């Protein structure tokens, strides 16, 4: 039996928004979601226990997500080769390999969930889901953060359209709604975006 939904959170703000999303549901739908707390960049303290007691979530998991720098073999793939084809070839290998290396640390089988909500899909979880070909919903990392700092465009400056096309085909991964397996991107205000994703 498929589980309803799961939220992957990296910050307290992400958890706050996940709670609001759950509280906004009809009462009979609440309490059926899972919550994943990534410890890659945040110390959540006793939040796991508190979330379990809240009744808002059916299950709460720790996620020992690893940054790409944890995997020494990936460092070489981040180096500039001096050519666009060489860089794109390394980028394809990097995206695939980071997803693969992350797998032992992933605490749940995401294929068991109907809806997957990922805050900050630029973190390794985005690469993992892309590598596994698992569809998900991206959620804006912070209130209007894309309005003020569009990481997808900044991180992929130089030949952005080519890279976005490659991401749409699944050859590389780009965050914030550009990846093949990202179904949509939830933002606070689409009117505020310079580059709305269509």
Place the predicted regions along the sequence by residue.
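Generic start-of-chain signal for non-secretory N-termini
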Residues: 1-3
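Long, charge-rich alpha-helical interaction segments
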Residues: 186-198
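Active-site and donor-binding regions of nucleotide-sugar-utilizing enzymes
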Residues: 6-173, 177
């Amino acid at each position: 039996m498929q589980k309803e939904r799961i939220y992957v959170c990296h910050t307290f703000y992400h958890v706050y928004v996940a709670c609001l999303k759950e509280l906004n549901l009809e009462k009979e739908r609440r309490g059926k979601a899972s919550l994943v707390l990534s410890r890659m960049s945040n110390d959540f303290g006793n939040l796991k226990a508190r979330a379990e007691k809240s009744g808002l979530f059916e299950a709460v998991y720790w996620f020992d997500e690893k940054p790409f720098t944890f995997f020494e073999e990936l460092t070489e793939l981040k180096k500039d080769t001096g050519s666009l084809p060489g860089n794109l070839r390394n980028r394809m290998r990097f995206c695939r390999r980071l997803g693969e290396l992350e797998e032992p640390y992933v605490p749940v089988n995401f294929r068991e969930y109907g809806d997957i909500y990922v805050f900050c899909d630029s973190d390794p979880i985005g690469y993992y889901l892309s590598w596994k070909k698992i569809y998900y919903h991206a959620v804006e990392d912070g209130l209007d953060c894309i309005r003020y700092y569009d990481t997808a465009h900044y991180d992929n400056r130089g030949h952005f359209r080519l890279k976005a096309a490659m991401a749409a085909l699944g050859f590389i991964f780009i965050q914030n709604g550009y990846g093949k397996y990202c179904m949509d991107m939830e933002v606070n205000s689409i009117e505020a975006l310079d580059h709305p994703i269509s």
